[in-house]
Swiss-Prot record:
Comp. bias (Basic residues): 10-20
Quaternary structure note: Part of the 50S ribosomal subunit.
Chain segments carrying region Disordered: 1-57
Gene3D superfamilies linked: 3.100.10.10
GO CC annotation: cytosolic large ribosomal subunit
Protein name: Large ribosomal subunit protein uL15
Amino acid sequence: MRLHDVKPQKGSKKRKKRVARGISAGQGASAGLGMRGQKSRSGSGTRPGFEGGQQPLYRRLPKLKGFPIVNQKIYTTINVEKLASLPANTEVTLASLKAAGILTAVKGPLKILGNGELSTPLKVQAAAFTGTARSKIEAAGGSCEVL
């Protein structure tokens, strides 16, 4: 194959339809716009979101209330039940959880949540604990250290 053999792909060089050029041209008279109505007039078209005079969706829905949280803390969260698979007396940190494959994506500092049961004692180091998570870890014989 040489450069002069290269041809455009079939269907890629489609000609534009020439409308309103006489009846015999195929798209004459109304130029494919139908008989009458707003959409057949010149400069036609309504603005985006216009619903024909009906109250549009963006006006029917209430406005959002409140303010955005400015310096929001985004934590990497994990439940106590995920820590149950670790061996006893393990030091649990963000790095160790990632190495063990329990965490995949790290969004920020580690926060331990209290969903599930824990029976093995663990030494957990995290940026934050919920009250139930702290009580479950300490009830299992482990310790909680806030970084």
